[in-house]
């Protein structure tokens, strides 16, 4: 048993909550499995709940530990499993939330206050709220986001539910805690403490790998320290690194923002050890240039060092900016719609101008054409300030039919907020976009679910396919034939079918029904829907493949938990949330930006099992000097 596991068991036997902090490649999941096995051995009649971030992680832990008293599930499944039998309380709480403006839950198409008997009146006596892959509140069906918000409200409001869960599970463990929604942490470390029943809560993860804005990031405020003796969680650090070579470990340690400093594994069988029992040295290199020479660098790595960028299991190219990848990955049109549609840009230009003039509320209820007439009438001398820019005008003239339709659409649907995160947000791609907090639009989330279900069917994973679809059961041979023919049609004709056609077919076959969120999105975004629905479904498939990592390139967000022999990191971005120059010198950026950037860079660097190359196009002298400090002067190269 690892010494870190021994310390954790000591805390468990004392009834103390704990956190296992382990850096990249430390074997945190292995420690989690060891802890579970030891708890089972010591408390064979007690049930253990283990929450993980994705279904893939659920299956991995279940494969390693097979015991009837172990319940491994995603966070959402755990929450629903524990509140689903409190139907009266669910209905009461849902009604309260539907009638509260800031609850994050609303009833599509319903005006006024929702009556207290909404989920009981004119329904069967045994009518129950259900949790599914889609939301239809009118029918009492909630989805992932609603389960999280509903659960938090119910655990706060009903101590008896807390008591029920603590009695049911004396041990609750959370894997990858840093990505967990803060509401979950509040339930486990605040609401749980208000009920005296014994229950040990354990967290496993790494705050340096907290790269999603909606995750808790860390639980430092709950840790028991000299400065915080009233905390409720004991920290145990796991310092060994079993993945990375020494050169990468040294670099990664210089990036960490906490007290944890990793060291090579002492296990001679660890992947980063040589045959004679020494840690691999590996290599780190920093390349820079006066202009973008990415292709030149990739040719050099291929020809001189034998890198094979088509071998996605061993070699990975990481970029931050999706735009650099869209053309190569085959979703250029969808990217253009979400990131640089000129009619939407014109709508935003009108909105911003109207706001400065105090007339935004006057034009919000109008169609686009009428809103332009209002501005033209009120501010004729300011026409240059609200007229289309040259680029916007060129697009409008080249797409006159599209613009003519847009003129008759609601102004707010044109001047809407849309960005590439709504197409490509990297949150929870393993779990088909299931994670709460994903920035995917409801429409793109729906497209991802369709392709996910198709892939399950093609992989002959019929149990997971049935669980993921809206199909209740297949009882007739004709039904099975219709389903197979429908999926075969999509797979064989995706080049010729539009996104709209595939959505309708998947809905009719109940592979993926159009729920409240999708219908609301289509209704409230007629211009975006007009543009997206006519795009080839092939682009949606390419987006899915890209988000799932089935391409030779990725954004840096996508690789947490993965590892490759060769890693190329390209530090090129125009995102305001990150500033790569701040990695190399103090340029006065806000700490939140510096912290976010360092964590993302840390995740990228620690993917490398052998060789790490970092490339910075158009690097300044200050960046180059900072790189020499981080990488060592002998590891700096120009192209």
Residues covered by each model-derived region:
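The feature marks helicase ATPase cores and/or their adjacent C-terminal helical subdomains
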Residues: 1-639
């Amino acid at each position: 048993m690892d010494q870190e596991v021994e310390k954790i068991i000591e805390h468990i036997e004392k009834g103390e909550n704990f956190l296992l902090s382990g850096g990249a490649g430390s074997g945190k999941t292995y420690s989690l499995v060891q802890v579970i096995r030891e708890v089972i051995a010591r408390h064979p009649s007690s049930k253990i709940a283990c929450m993980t971030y994705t279904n893939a992680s659920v299956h991995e832990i279940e494969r390693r530990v097979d015991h009837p008293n172990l319940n491994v599930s995603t966070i959402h499944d755990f929450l629903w499993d524990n509140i689903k039998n409190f139907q009266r309380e669910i209905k009461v709480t849902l009604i309260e939330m539907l009638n509260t403006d800031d609850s994050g839950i609303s009833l599509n198409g319903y005006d006024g206050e929702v009556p207290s008997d909404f989920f009981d009146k004119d329904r069967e006596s045994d009518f129950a709220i259900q949790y599914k892959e889609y939301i239809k509140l009118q029918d009492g069906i909630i989805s992932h986001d609603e389960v999280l918000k509903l659960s938090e409200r119910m655990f706060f409001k009903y101590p008896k539910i807390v008591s029920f869960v603590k009695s049911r599970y004396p041990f609750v463990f959370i894997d990858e805690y840093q990505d967990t929604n803060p509401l979950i942490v509040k339930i486990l470390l605040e609401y749980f403490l208000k009920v005296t029943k014994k229950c040990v809560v354990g967290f496993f993860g790494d705050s340096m790998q907290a790269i999603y804005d909606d995750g808790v990031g860390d639980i430092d405020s709950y840790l028991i320290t000299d400065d915080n003796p009233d905390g409720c969680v004991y920290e145990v650090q796991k310092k060994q690194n079993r993945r990375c070579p020494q050169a990468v470990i040294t670099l990664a340690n210089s990036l960490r923002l906490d007290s944890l400093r990793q060291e090579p594994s002492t296990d001679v069988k660890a992947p980063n050890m040589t045959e004679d029992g020494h840690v691999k040295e590996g290599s780190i290199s920093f390349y820079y240039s006066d202009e973008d020479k990415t292709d030149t660098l990739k040719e050099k790595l291929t020809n001189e060092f034998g890198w094979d960028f088509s071998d996605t299991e061993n070699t990975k190219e990481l970029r931050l900016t999706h735009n650099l990848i869209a053309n190569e990955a085959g979703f250029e049109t969808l990217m253009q719609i979400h990131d640089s549609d000129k009619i939407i840009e014109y709508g935003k230009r009108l909105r911003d101008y109207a706001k400065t003039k105090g007339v935004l509320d006057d034009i919000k209820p109008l169609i686009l054409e009428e809103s332009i007439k209002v501005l033209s009438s009120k501010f004729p001398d300011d026409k240059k300030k609200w007229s289309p820019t040259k680029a916007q005008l060129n697009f409008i003239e080249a797409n006159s039919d599209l613009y003519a339709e847009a003129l008759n659409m609601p102004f707010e649907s044109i001047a809407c907020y849309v960005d590439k995160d709504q197409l490509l947000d990297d949150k929870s791609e393993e779990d088909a976009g299931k994670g709460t907090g994903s920035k995917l639009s409801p429409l793109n989330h729906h497209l991802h679910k369709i392709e996910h279900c198709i892939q399950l069917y093609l992989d002959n994973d019929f149990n997971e396919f049935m669980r993921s679809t809206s199909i209740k059961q297949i009882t007739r041979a004709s039904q099975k034939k219709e389903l197979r023919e429908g999926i075969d049609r999509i797979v064989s004709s995706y080049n010729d079918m539009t996104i709209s056609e595939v959505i309708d077919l998947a809905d009719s076959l109940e592979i993926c029904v159009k729920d409240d969120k999708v219908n609301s999105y289509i209704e409230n975004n007629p211009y975006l829907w007009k543009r997206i629905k006519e795009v080839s479904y092939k682009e949606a498939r390419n987006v899915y493949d890209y988000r799932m990592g089935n391409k030779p390139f990725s954004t840096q967000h996508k690789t947490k938990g993965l590892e490759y022999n060769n890693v190329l990191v390209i530090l090129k971005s125009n995102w305001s949330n990150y500033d790569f120059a701040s990695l190399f010198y103090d340029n006065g950026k806000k700490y939140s930006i510096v912290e976010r950037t360092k964590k993302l860079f840390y995740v990228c660097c620690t993917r490398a099992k052998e060789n790490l190359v970092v490339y910075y196009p158009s690097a300044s002298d200050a960046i180059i000097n900072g790189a020499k400090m981080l990488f060592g002067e002998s590891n700096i190269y120009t192209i």
